[in-house]
């Protein structure tokens, strides 16, 4: 699949780390570092603009290493970039740790996964089909 991209950043285009990677790392595009304080959130520019084909979205997800090592996540995870959005991709990061986190220019801050999606149509009914699970949720299967 080809995706049109404008790269106004100082960095190379995102790429897959391996042949089986689902996501591409996205880098911060900053004129100066950002200090993200504990429990603070900020919008981090990437300098990337894309045009996805109809029927696709780009999901912005946290990087697992930043999450476990530094407590840094994507606040609206996954963030969705719709196929008709043409603005700059910016990432909402949140610091869930107890220490300041410095975001440097070029740092890999999130990953992007391109995914197909469908539009759904609502079909109003009076009763839903029964299933074995039923209304069970939020830990209904217990600890095993």
Swiss-Prot record:
UniProt pathway: Pyrimidine metabolism; dUMP biosynthesis; dUMP from dCTP (dUTP route): step 2/2
Biological process terms in GO annotation: dUMP biosynthetic process; dUTP catabolic process
EC number(s) recorded for this UniProt protein: 3.6.1.23
GO molecular function (one): dUTP diphosphatase activity
Cofactor or coenzyme needed: Mg(2+)
Signal peptide: none
Lineage: superkingdom: Bacteria
Function: This enzyme is involved in nucleotide metabolism: it produces dUMP, the immediate precursor of thymidine nucleotides and it decreases the intracellular concentration of dUTP so that uracil cannot be incorporated into DNA.
HAMAP family registered for this protein in UniProt: dUTPase_bact
Family: Belongs to the dUTPase family.
Protein name according to UniProt: Deoxyuridine 5'-triphosphate nucleotidohydrolase
